[in-house]
């Protein structure tokens, strides 16, 4: 079982065993200070300072949405949501950069550099196709609409607490 002790000797979790059926909706209730948030942080992998073992079935992923999510000031709603698919965003950006380099005289004059660039472009193209990255904007828009996020160009500094949580949830759900 999982155990958690806070210094000096406050045990909030003692010999906890949990199993969830596929598709089950789970609620965790308890008094203040009883370990609800601690348990969720352990399950999500945020808190690693505990005794015992947490095991997941293959293919499952776990996310954790804080009560007051941290959103980088100055960013727009869309920029925050894109953080959930940052690897795809970075791949698309690199693909654009590679394509721009095809016009570079240094590349045009060196067959080895041209071959390397063509190979990199092919690798990126495969990755883009495999992740359906060409449709990323419509996926983001659908996700933001489904969660009733504020307009994508709104700066997160001006959002209410509920709006901030919806934006953070959208980012979390888009993560792989």
Regions found by a protein language model. Name each.
Residues 1-176:
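ABC ATP-binding cassette signature C-motif
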């Amino acid at each position: 079982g999982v155990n958690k002790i806070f210094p000096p000797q406050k045990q909030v979790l003692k010999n906890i065993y949990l199993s969830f059926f596929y598709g089950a909706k789970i609620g965790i209730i308890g008094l203040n200070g009883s370990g609800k948030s601690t348990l969720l942080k352990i399950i999500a992998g945020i808190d690693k300072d505990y005794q015992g073992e947490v095991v997941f079935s293959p293919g499952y992923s776990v996310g954790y949405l804080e009560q007051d999510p941290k959103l980088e000031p100055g960013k727009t709603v869309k920029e925050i949501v894109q953080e959930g698919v940052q690897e795809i965003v970075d791949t698309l950006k690199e693909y654009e950069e590679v394509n721009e380099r095809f016009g570079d005289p240094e590349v045009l004059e060196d067959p080895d550099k041209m071959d390397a660039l063509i190979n990199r472009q092919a690798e990126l193209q495969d990755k883009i196709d495999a992740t359906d990255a060409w449709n990323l904007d419509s996926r983001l828009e659908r996700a933001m609409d489904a969660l009733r996020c504020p307009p994508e160009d709104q700066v997160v500094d001006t959002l209410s607490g509920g709006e901030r949580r919806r934006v953070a949830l959208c980012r979390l759900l888009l993560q792989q």
